[in-house]
Amino acid sequence: MGARKKISAEKRKEALKTMYFAKLQNVPTSPRKMRLVADMIRGMEVNRALGVLKFSSKEASARVEKLLRSAIANWEQKNERKAESGELFVTKIYVDGGATLKRMRPAPQGRGYRIRKRSNHVTLFVDSKSTNDNQN
């Protein structure tokens, strides 16, 4: 590994120590449907976001709820203390498209229609309000 590449890798590693996030990869839901759920909780306090996700009728909300609980646990693990009520917020959440499986469906007159089974990757960041104020 070159010197510049090693330095940038070390900087990236140091930056990750102060970020609290969780990733969910290869979720078999279309990114469009998952983004609807992500938009519901973006910027919310985590306890309120958990309540919104728990009572949402969308199938993707259960997966995002589990991801949010994982991000909270990651924050608690790195800070070595429990998160207090109203302390943590969902700072960023984004949904990227994953691999698309292409399948064929029989159609009239010997043709075949292509079915695209989409998947996505979700990345969720949480942080405390005090560190958000310092960054802005």
UniProtKB/Swiss-Prot annotation:
Keywords noted in UniProt: Ribonucleoprotein, Ribosomal protein, RNA-binding, rRNA-binding
InterPro entries referenced in this protein's UniProt entry, alphabetically: Ribosomal_uL22, Ribosomal_uL22_bac/chlpt-type, Ribosomal_uL22_bac/org-type, Ribosomal_uL22_sf
Signal peptide: none
CDD domains reported in the protein's UniProt record: Ribosomal_L22 (cd00336)
GO molecular function annotations of the record: rRNA binding; structural constituent of ribosome
Keyword Transmembrane among record annotations: no
Entry GO terms, CC: cytosolic large ribosomal subunit
BP-aspect Gene Ontology terms: translation
Domain of life: Bacteria
Cystine crosslinks: none
Gene3D superfamilies attached to this UniProt entry: Ribosomal protein L22/L17 (3.90.470.10)
Family: Belongs to the universal ribosomal protein uL22 family.
Oligomeric and partner information: Part of the 50S ribosomal subunit.
Function in brief: This protein binds specifically to 23S rRNA; its binding is stimulated by other ribosomal proteins, e.g. L4, L17, and L20. It is important during the early stages of 50S assembly. It makes multiple contacts with different domains of the 23S rRNA in the assembled 50S subunit and ribosome. The globular domain of the protein is located near the polypeptide exit tunnel on the outside of the subunit, while an extended beta-hairpin is found that lines the wall of the exit tunnel in the center of the 70S ribosome.
PANTHER family with a match to the protein in the record: CHLOROPLAST 50S RIBOSOMAL PROTEIN L22-RELATED, LARGE RIBOSOMAL SUBUNIT PROTEIN UL22M
Record protein name field: Large ribosomal subunit protein uL22
Organism field: Phocaeicola vulgatus (strain ATCC 8482 / DSM 1447 / JCM 5826 / CCUG 4940 / NBRC 14291 / NCTC 11154) (Bacteroides vulgatus)
Gene: rplV
